[in-house]
Structures are given as C-alpha cells and as structure tokens.
Design a protein with these regions (language model features):
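N-terminal Lys/Arg-rich, disordered targeting/topogenic segments
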Residues: 1-9
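Hydrophobic membrane-insertion alpha-helices, especially the h-region
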Residues: 9-30
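Alpha-helical transmembrane signal-anchor/signal-peptide segments
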Residues: 31-51
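Membrane-embedded segments
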Residues: 58, 65, 69-149
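Secreted/periplasmic serine-hydrolase-like ester/acetyl group-modifying domain
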Residues: 120, 129-231, 319
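Active-site segments of SGNH/GDSL-like serine hydrolases
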Residues: 222-249
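Substrate-gating cap/lid alpha-helix
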Residues: 241-274
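Histidine-centered active-site loop/cap adjacent to the catalytic His
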Residues: 288-319
C-alpha cells in the first residue's frame, strides 16, 4: 500500500475542502444576507452585518438601540422627516439587554452621533452580557478589519447557520429578519399571526423594591454617552393596559418602574418619555402584549419627535 501517496491525496482533499468551505463562508457574507456568526443569536448577527454595511456607507446623527422594543416599535422614517434627526440608524435586535446595548455601542464609531434613543420595556434592564462569543473579533469586524479566525470558525457552524437563518425569517411573525433601509422591522397588522400566549404574556418582573442597581447598565450607558457629548433618550414603551390592570402586583411594579425612571432622568440628566402613559393605546395598536403594529410605531415615534423638538426649543430659550 502506498501510504505516502494515500496521505498526500487525503491531505490534498482536506485542504481543498477547507478552502472551498472558507470561500463559501466569505461569499455568503459578502454577497448574500447570510451573516457571519459572532453571537448566539442569528437575528443579532444579521443586525451586526447590516449595521457595519450601513456605517461604511454614510454617517448618522441618531442611533436607535434596544431589544425588539426598539426594532419593532420605532419608525425611523418619522424621525428623519422631523426637525430633530437627519440620518437615523436602528442598531437594535431581539432580546438585547441594556448591558448588551452598551457593549455594542462601545464597538461602534460614535464621532458623528448626537443622540441615542433607547426604546425599552422593564424587562430590558435585567440580564448580563451573554450573546457575543468573541468580543475582540466583533470589535475588529465593526472597524472593518479582517476577521480570519471568525471565518474559519464559521465553517463548522455553516449547517447550523443555514438552518437558524431560514427558521427565523418568517414574515408576519416576531421572528422576521428583513429590515427596512433604517434597520426597523415594523409589523403590518394585516396578515400578522397573533400568538395568543404572547398576547396575554406578562414577562417576569422583580418582586423586591427597585433601586439604582436595577438600572446600573442604563446608568453606565448614560455615563458613556455623556462623556462623548451624546444625548440619551429613554422610552418606556406601551403595554396592554388590560394586562396591567389584571394583576395588582404587576400594576404596582409597572408604575413604580416608570416613576423611578422619571426621577432618575432628572438626576442623571437624560431625556425620559413614558410613552405608555402619554399615548394610552387601546388594543387596536398591539400585535401582542407589548409589540405595536406599524400605526402604533408611527404614533410612538411621532411622540418622541415632538418631545425632542420641545426639548430643543427649551434649550434654545435658555441660551
């Protein structure tokens, strides 16, 4: 048996296979919507790819950040049509906690950004950083640098990436991955598949009194932005009022939560908008307990634009 010849042939096939797989990963990342996998969340990876491509093309004065409360409940076009923002980019992704919002912003060039809008709900302040697999590699990618290590790691994850990408990309559900030009995913009510469980869901909330430690990641985010001369705007999104009133303990917590944020905003000098109280939406604006349809997203964003215009006017008056 010609072992040397066999090993040489085997080695050649192995090198050829790895090279072909490597080129496939590179090609998919460059020429399709399939993202490189930097995180445990394929939806986050899709947003990371989108964000890098957008940031390479132009600069933005306003970033939208957060979980699906920002991804689905903000209509960036409304902001751009107002006088408060010219170029808006939505960097949000499903399930991003406040800690992960700060982590991502630390990897992004903020030199042209004047305002960051954090659209949130009470459950976004809980949770630590856990989605990013290799923070150093992701930071290199966001700077436009070559990430050879990640390309090779993605060869092994290619079957899983294909499966997860096509599993999650379902129009008319909360899992839809196709962003508009700003990075939003606004839900069109017609044809939307309303999930009965999510319509009646009250996510877990703390049963102990709130203090600053509950908002430590928000405070760290605010400090990070203030150091760079960037305004932070925090929004509490609407929640189905019927659900709030159905649980006395939750109702008490929800109002305590919004009151605490209001007080905190005055001390820490960020803009706070309690959109739940100000809009007082009925069920016709919701697709589940706390996600809005496209009309609800437009109205919420118009409220934000109007409030920021008032803030800008009051500051001019103070000069």
């Amino acid at each position: 048996v010609d072992y040397a010849g066999w090993l040489k042939a085997w080695f050649g096939y192995a090198v050829g296979f790895v090279a072909a797989a490597f080129l496939l990963v590179v090609g998919l990342e460059h020429y399709t919507d399939m993202p490189l996998r930097f995180t445990k969340s394929v939806s986050y990876d899709v947003k990371i790819k989108f964000a890098r491509e957008q940031l390479e093309e132009k600069s933005f004065d306003t970033f939208i950040v957060g979980s699906s409360m920002a991804l689905n409940n903000i209509d960036s076009a409304v902001l751009e049509s107002s006088h408060v923002s010219q170029h808006v980019l939505n960097l949000s992704s499903w399930g991003l906690a406040a800690s992960e919002v700060l982590q991502f912003l630390q990897m992004v060039d903020l030199s042209d950004v004047r305002r960051v809008i954090y659209s949130s709900q009470y459950f976004d302040y809980q949770g630590e950083v856990d989605k990013v697999l290799d923070e150093r590699e992701l930071a290199r990618y966001m700077k436009g640098q070559w990430v050879l290590k990640t390309y090779f790691q993605n060869i092994a994850r290619l079957p899983e990436s294909f499966m997860r990408y096509f599993e999650e990309d379902h129009q008319g559900t909360q899992r839809y991955l196709k962003f508009d030009e700003h990075g939003d995913v606004n839900f069109v009510r017609e044809g939307f598949k309303i999930n009965k469980h999510k319509w009646e869901e009250i996510p877990p909330f703390p049963k102990t009194p709130l203090d600053d430690s509950y908002f430590k990641h928000l405070l760290a985010l605010n400090d990070y932005l203030k150091d760079r001369g960037i305004e932070l705007v925090v929004i509490t999104n609407p929640f189905r009022q019927e659900l709030i009133e159905s649980d006395e303990e939750f109702q008490s917590f929800f109002h305590t939560h919004t009151d605490y944020l209001k007080r905190l905003s005055k001390v820490q000098r960020f803009v706070y908008i309690n959109a739940h109280a100000e809009l007082n939406f009925d069920d016709t604006y919701f697709v589940d307990a706390y996600h809005l349809d496209e009309t609800g997203a437009q109205r919420l964003t118009q409220l934000v634009a109007d409030r920021l215009e008032l803030v800008r006017f009051s500051r001019v008056q103070d000069l």
